[in-house]
Amino acid sequence: MSHFFAHLSRLKLINRWPLMRNVRTENVSEHSLQVAFVAHALAIIKNRKFNGNLNAERIALLAMYHDASEVITGDLPTPIKYHNPKIAHEYKKIEKVAQQKLIEMLPKELQHDFRCLLDEHYYSEEEKALVKQADALCAYLKCLEELSAGNNEFIQAKARLEKTLAIRQSPEMDYFMAVFVPSFSLSLDEISLDSLD
């Protein structure tokens, strides 16, 4: 018997942004799906508009599993995780142990297939960068949603993420930011108007 998927099912019980007041709580499971949507889109944009040659479906899978180890470690708040390089380095080691523990829950004949999704060492540098871009973009989108709902708790997080996005800047991310991001600050009525025309 394997407990792998029973563990992954519990990602929905782990809330993100645990130290901040949220208008709407976000869990790791739904965050992972949104990161998969965005990473997939970034890969397609890169391929279609900027001469990329990425496997968009693989990118979506990598993004889906990118926080899977948090079912064991929990979601450590960013200010703590990156407080200093030593803490960040040690936390990476903890994540690695958690990833290995998850992989060992699988039947032997499936372990390699999932190791390629759970362990960043199997990602190309380009795949890793794209998933990190999508992860940061989704955190930024969460900030926009919270701010548009009147929650000023996310002002500093938004400013920090804008710096992160500037560091991770790419043509495909610029395209995504210009074409898709503005809608996240609008109401349902506003985003529905264009759809009905």
From Swiss-Prot:
PROSITE patterns: HD. Catalyzes the strictly specific dephosphorylation of 2'-deoxyribonucleoside 5'-monophosphates. Its main location: cytoplasm. The keyword Cytoplasm applies. It catalyses: a 2'-deoxyribonucleoside 5'-phosphate + H2O = a 2'-deoxyribonucleoside + phosphate. One of its GO terms (cellular component) is cytoplasm. Homodimer. Its EC number is 3.1.3.89. Keywords: Cytoplasm, Hydrolase, Metal-binding, Nucleotide-binding. It comes from Yersinia pestis. NCBIfam families: PRK03826.1. Belongs to the 5DNU family. This is 5'-deoxynucleotidase YPO2559. HAMAP family: 5DNU. A divalent metal cation binds at residues 31, 66-67, 135. Substrate binds at residues 16-17, 31, 67, 75-78, 135. Its cofactor is a divalent metal cation. InterPro entries: HD/PDEase_dom, HD_domain, YfbR, YfbR/HDDC2. It is an enzyme of class 3 (hydrolase). The record marks 16 as: Appears to be important in orienting the phosphate for catalysis. One of its GO terms (molecular function) is nucleotide binding. The lineage of its organism: Bacteria, Pseudomonadati, Pseudomonadota, Gammaproteobacteria, Enterobacterales. It is found in: Cytoplasm. Residues 28-140 form the HD domain. Pfam families: YfbR-like.
